[in-house]
């Protein structure tokens, strides 16, 4: 108990929160890559063993509001320490599983602890009012790199061991990093309590319209992001015949698109610190409408470059909504609003595969999916139109800390 009192109300440099974001996405994808090997151990096929991971992803979203509530009641820094040790110990428990029920329970436990990061870690990040957009962009890149690194790292571990090694190594690393994170916690020089003492206790003017616009862009953007990250590798396999018909090559090209586009978040984050988010969100939406539609029409090299630009606009949207939140929502409410936003994102993401499956099974070609996503991007354009323009005096992230 004394140890947790010692870390309550503290903060940590951005780099450590960014690495935590990397680990959050990485740990959630360990099973995705190790599932086939685990299935062989338990005598199950890939499609059968994958069911063990469903609970983890459901809890990953569903427990976010609970994590936000606990952080508001106790301490964000304490919850973040629990996050690292929790995902680490849960991963080790997964490695010790002797039945698929034990494995499912352990993966569910990973999901529970992994749910802490987005409502709590992001809220810690935006406590500081310095260059919020840019810092959110950098943080987003770390999360994307966690997604990209998981298949590579787990693939290497599988060449020297089995699925148990994948969970053990990942869990031990998370615990070791959790100790580093805890040691790097420092006193918050601008605690939320001091901001509240200056009157920053309510939402900024126009917050209803701003959160409505954020909800529209989150829902439509979440579906587009989920669908694009799922269908692009397969679309490249069938639509780049002049470049390659190799699954390995087209997969590499898809990875290049994702990796390059993810860095757009930094540029958009830098821009949103200087330009009203209304116009940035509007422009990102227009870019998605145009270039996602072009991706449905092109093949080969034209498709590759159109898809690269389209994904830049898709990834570029990520830091915008959290920046909007920091300007309209007081610190005391941010974790709760972030948790709801994250849960909506996951719910929308869960609908991607069934909806895409129904469309393709109905006889439509894959290009029709991109036409659908281009149409959905109109909602992002509309969200940009609805988003109010704030004066500096109205922005909550510009209020004095003391």
Predicted features and spans:
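Residue-level signature of mid-helix packing/kink "hotspots" within the transmembrane helices
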Residues: 29, 57-65, 147-148, 258-266, ...
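Cytoplasmic helix-loop-helix junction between adjacent transmembrane helices
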Residues: 106-143
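C-terminal transmembrane helical hairpin of 12-TM major facilitator-type secondary transporters
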Residues: 275-321
